[in-house]
Swiss-Prot record:
This is Small ribosomal subunit protein uS4. Pfam families: Ribosomal_S4 (PF00163), S4 (PF01479). One of the primary rRNA binding proteins, it binds directly to 16S rRNA where it nucleates assembly of the body of the 30S subunit. With S5 and S12 plays an important role in translational accuracy. Part of the 30S ribosomal subunit. Contacts protein S5. The interaction surface between S4 and S5 is involved in control of translational fidelity. Keywords: Ribonucleoprotein, Ribosomal protein, RNA-binding, rRNA-binding. Residues 96-156 form the S4 RNA-binding domain. Disulfide bonds: none annotated. The keyword RNA-binding applies. GO terms for biological process: ribosomal small subunit biogenesis; translation. The keyword Ribonucleoprotein applies.
Amino acid sequence: MARYLGPKLKLSRREGTDLFLKSGVRAIDSKCKIDTAPGQHGARKPRLSDYGVQLREKQKVRRIYGILEKQFRNYYREATRLKGNTGENLLQLLEGRLDNVVYRMGFATTRAEARQLVSHKAIVVNGKVVNIPSSQVSPEDVVTVREKAKKQARIKAALDLAAQREKPTWIEINADKMEGVYKRLPERSDLSADINEQLIVELYSK
C-alpha cells in the first residue's frame, strides 16, 4: 500500500477528528466541517457497525502516526508479545518511533516532516546518525539535531511553534542545543484521550 500524498484535511474529515497532519498548533479551523465526509457537499457520516467503528479507529491511529497497514499490524503483533495491556503497549511502540520522538521534541512541525529529517540524516541518537524513521528510541536515549542541520530554517520554525504547545512530560528538551532526552515510556494518561486503542485490539482479535 502506497503512502497517502493527497490533501491532509480530507483525511481528518474522513476520520472525524484532527489528525495533526498539517503544521500549526492546531490544524483544523472553523472552515473545516469535521463532522461531514470529504468533498464540497460531503454528507454526514452514516452510523457504523461495530466492525466499522473498530476499523475507523485503527485507520485513524495509523494515519496519525503515518504507518502503513503492514507496519501497523506488525506493531500490534509485537504489542501482544509484551507484558501488560496490549493497547497501551501498541501506543508506546508507536510513540517510541524515532520520527515520532523527533516530532514530539519539536524539531519538526509534523510527523511527516520528522520522517524526512530522519531519512535525510539530520538526526543523531546517542552520538550516532540514524536514518531509519521506524527505529525505536529507548528511555534515556539522547536525540539531537545533527550539527550541519541546525541552521535549517524549518527546524527553527518548528521549535518556535513547539514552544506554543504543551510539552510532553516524558521528554526533556533543550531547544537552544536542539537536543532532547526520551526520559521514559509515556503512560496511557500522557497520551490523547481521543484514541480508543481497545477498539483496535478488538478488531485484530477477531
